[in-house]
């Protein structure tokens, strides 16, 4: 339910309140791991002239670094507000939620002279469902059961290279 999820998000942000912005670098170094197959997925897509965007309900302090490391063409997420090198526990408006994810899908498709039906979108949460339904290929990746049951394409056990197989790539086409 959206209301309880929203309260959880507020609670999580409040837990960050007052922490040094340096905690982000520490978390990135010590706690963040990349999903298996992420690097191969992005390298293979890039070498074949594909465009990729990371659109997340998370925070830009993380997505910018993840996006740069993996080679996404652009990334969009929520901006944590800071004051005097400390996190305030607040997020810059507008919040990137389910409506904004759909808007980004259309904006990016339009920018590339594509229809949304020519785009693959991947998600795992309820806030991804509208975006997944508007994309030509909406993929539930290791999604919650309530999300997976609403998507025709589900990846429950494979790594991110499964997205390459969905597009017709064979393993010998992968760029490692």
Regions found by a protein language model. Name each.
Residues 1-11:
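Single conserved hydrophobic/aromatic residue that forms the stacking wall/gate
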Residues 17-176:
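C-terminal cap/substrate-recognition subdomain and adjoining C-terminal extension
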């Amino acid at each position: 339910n959206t209301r309880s999820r929203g309260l959880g998000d507020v609670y999580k942000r409040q837990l960050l309140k007052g922490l040094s912005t340096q905690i982000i670098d520490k978390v990135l170094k010590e706690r963040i791991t990349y999903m298996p197959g992420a690097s191969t997925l992005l390298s293979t897509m890039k070498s074949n002239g594909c465009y990729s965007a990371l659109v997340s309900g998370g925070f830009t302090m993380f997505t910018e670094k993840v996006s740069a490391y993996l080679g996404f063409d652009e990334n969009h997420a929520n901006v944590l507000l800071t004051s005097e090198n400390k996190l305030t526990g607040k997020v810059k408006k507008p919040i990137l939620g389910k409506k904004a994810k759909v808007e980004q899908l259309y904006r990016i498709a339009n920018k590339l002279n594509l229809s949304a039906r020519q785009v693959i979108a991947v998600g795992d949460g309820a806030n991804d469902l509208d975006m997944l339904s508007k994309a030509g290929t909406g993929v539930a990746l290791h999604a919650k059961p309530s999300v997976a049951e609403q998507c025709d394409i589900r990846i429950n056990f494979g790594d991110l290279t499964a997205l390459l197989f969905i597009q017709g790539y064979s393993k010998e086409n992968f760029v490692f």
